């Protein structure tokens, strides 16, 4: 992990406020620019499932299992704080704000137009541009025994 990445993710893992214009805020905007570039490639046409896996791996900075499937369009304003298990399906028009962390477990299906947000703007009008990380979001599959 790059030094700036570590600095950012250590900071947000402590749920400290990200002040507008701060070094952490600037890093976050750099992640967003990178994510926009990669999601344009993910969303740009007829990628094979393997190509989508490779692009999503590049977006997250982690190896994504070949069983991963995604129907574009897909949006994120970070990408580097998403982890994905096996047999994950993300349907179209989802938007993940993953700066605070998003862990998607095995066998998870995510429906159309799902928004997952891990940051929130402060309510104070004078500090509205500041944000607070809300911690890691966990998406899990609940396996049930349907045998009678």
Mark where each language-model region is.
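Terminal amphipathic alpha-helical/low-complexity segments used for targeting or macromolecular assembly
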Residues: 1-65
């Amino acid at each position: 992990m790059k030094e700036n990445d570590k600095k950012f993710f250590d900071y947000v893992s402590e749920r400290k406020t990200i002040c507008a214009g701060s070094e952490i805020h600037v890093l976050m905007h750099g992640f967003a620019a990178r994510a926009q570039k990669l999601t344009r490639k993910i969303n740009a046409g007829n990628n094979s499932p393997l190509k989508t896996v490779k692009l999503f791996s590049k977006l997250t900075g982690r190896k994504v299992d070949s069983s991963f499937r995604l129907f574009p369009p897909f949006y994120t304003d970070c990408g580097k704080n998403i982890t994905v298990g096996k047999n994950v399906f993300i349907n179209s028009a989802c938007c993940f704000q993953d700066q605070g962390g998003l862990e998607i477990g095995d066998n998870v299906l995510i429906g159309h137009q799902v928004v997952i947000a891990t940051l929130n703007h402060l309510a104070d009008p004078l500090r509205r541009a500041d944000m607070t990380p809300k911690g890691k979001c966990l998406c899990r599959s609940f396996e049930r025994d349907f045998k009678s």
